Amino acid sequence: MTKKYRHLLFDLDGTLTDPMEGITRSVQHALRHFGIEVSDLRELCPFIGPPFAESFRTFYGFDDRQTSEAVSREYFTEKGIFENRLYDGMDELLDTLTSSGYTLCVATSKPRVFAERILDHFGIAPYFSFVGGTGLDGSLPTKADGIAHGLAG
């Protein structure tokens, strides 16, 4: 029997890893800078998934300047990025899939450089032949843009 699919595309947050602690603490830290206190981190779970900039605009009505300032807060890049955990059994799943001949890829709305750091941190980067994400410079602003860029070569 021939495999119907050879390439498998995974999201990062919520699929490979549970990013709740790092993302919500990062958002809490950024909001505190603006005098907004959120003590229950579960209130910030809607930030998991979409790009931070989009979420700050949607949930807090931030303008472009505030959004830029909020997403550039140092907490995530220094600490929050690693306040994250690999889902149980993920190593074994990825090993089984690659051993079975599948090509694995990651697509995320997170900046690609951060996604690569997370994959390296958990020791699972070697399983993936492609990591698509947004650019820190605003290029490839959506997950779909990152995927299209990767497919284009």
Could you say what each language-model-derived stretch is?
Residues K4, K79-V106, R112-E116, P141-A144, ...:
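Short, acidic loop-to-helix structural element flanking the phosphoryl-transfer center
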Residues M1-P46, G61-F62:
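Active-site neighborhood of HAD-like aspartate-dependent phosphohydrolases
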Residues R32-V38, S99-S100, G123-Y127:
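Short helix-capping segments at alpha-helix termini
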Residues T24, G49, A53, D91, ...:
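Alpha-helix N-cap/helix-start and coil->helix boundary motif
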Residues S26, D40-E43, P51-F56, F114, ...:
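Hydrophobic alpha-helical segments typical of transmembrane helices
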Residues P46-E78, D88-T98:
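A metal-dependent, Asp-based hydrolase signature
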Residues A125-L140:
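A short, structured active-site edge motif that brings together acidic residues
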Residues A30-L31, P50-D63, I118-H121, G150-L151:
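Helix-loop "lid/cap" segments that line or gate small-molecule binding pockets
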